[in-house]
Amino acid sequence: MSQQHTLPVTLPAALSQEPLKTVSPPPNTQQEHTKQPTPLPAPCQEVPSELPVEDPSKHKEKHTTPVKGVPEQEHELQQQQDSQEQELHLGQQQQQQEYQEQELHLGQQQQQQEYQEQELHLGQQQQQEYQEQELHLGQHQQQTSQEQKLHLGQQQQHQESQEQKLHLEQQQQEPQKQELHLGQQEAQEEELHLKQQQQECQKEEVHLEQQQQECQKEEVHLEQQQQECQKEEVHLEQQQQECQKEEVHLEQQQQECQKEEVHLEQQQQECQKEEVHLEQQQQETQELQQHQGAGILEQKLHQEKAQSEQQLKGQLDWEEKLLDQQLEQELAKRDEQLGKKEEQLLEPSEQQEGLLEQPTLVPAPSQLHENQAAQVPKGEVLLPIEQQRQQEVQWPVKHK
């Protein structure tokens, strides 16, 4: 006799609570059973089930697997599908049981009752297991939700702790940053202060260099002024020498004028001599007229006298004009030179008074005249320039 695996048949609670109904077998089967009595099974013999029945432990494991990371709706749908599968499975089992019950009903009623009791016991046990599975699933879901909540809480606490740590670190770093910032500001301010001091020192050095340059320029300017003063002194000496030369030239001109006057006097004396000679000639002519024809001699004498007088007048006029022109030219040149010299003498004296603290002594025109008067030889009186000019202009007129 081959070994057969006996599997417990689970019944729903509704079937287990309802009273079992006796099903009358069909008439054909009754006749067959009456004709051929079937041997009843032993009381302890188990009826093998032809249909495969799922292991409840596997079904339990299937329902006890924790669903992690699945939403609650999906989990409920899965539970509904599992319950539907269980109902279908139970329906199949119920049909099989009814068929077996019909077969077993033909047996002993006692065995049927025992079998029903077993089925009831199995149904109750299965119901208890199902309830336990539901409780286990609820507990598991509750535990998973609690674990998730705890995990989320722990994560939040961890994040909050990390944020607090970061905040504390930032708070701790802020005074350090402030100290660094203050140190940097102080260092920058010190650098700026040092730069400003360096710039001020450079400005002072530049100012000192400028002052030194100005002092050097002033020294050079003073040296130039001294050189100019020396040049002016040399120029004044040269002007004095030129004045002396001009005075000598004027003296020479005066001497020449005196010579010309002497020459004119000599010419006048010659003219007088010629007049005397003419008078003598006239007397002689008169005497000749007395001896010879008076008319012819008088005409000749008159002609000769007129010619000689014209010649003398022409010479005198020409000489006077030359003298006048020479005197006018010399006087104009002399006036120009004296005016320029006076201006040149006055300009350096005014410039020296404005530039130098100790003005150089410039001889005034009165001092020049005094020096000139001192240089004139004894016995001669030096007249003023205007009187000399008037005398020079009037002198040739007197001698006409």
Swiss-Prot record:
Region listing for Disordered, in residue ranges: 1-196, 273-312, 333-381
Which ranges are annotated Low complexity under compositional bias? Answer: 78-159, 169-186, 279-292, 346-358
Which GO cellular component does the record give, naming just one? cornified envelope
User: What's a BP term from Gene Ontology annotated to this protein?
Assistant: keratinization
Q: Does the keyword Transcription regulation apply?
A: no
One family from Pfam that matches here is Involucrin_N
Compositionally biased residues, Basic and acidic residues: 333-344
Tissue-specificity statement = Keratinocytes of epidermis and other stratified squamous epithelia.
Localization, per the record, is: Cytoplasm
Ordered alphabetically, the record's keywords are: Cytoplasm, Keratinization, Repeat
Q: List the InterPro entries hit by this protein, alphabetically.
A: Involucrin2, Involucrin_CS, Involucrin_N
Posttranslational modification, per the record? Substrate of transglutaminase. Specific glutamines or lysines are cross-linked to keratins, desmoplakin and to inter involucrin molecules.
Q: How does it assemble?
A: Directly or indirectly cross-linked to cornifelin (CNFN).
This molecule's function is given as: Part of the insoluble cornified cell envelope (CE) of stratified squamous epithelia.
Family assignment?
Answer: Belongs to the involucrin family.
* Name of the protein described by the UniProt record: Involucrin
Q: Which gene encodes it?
A: IVL
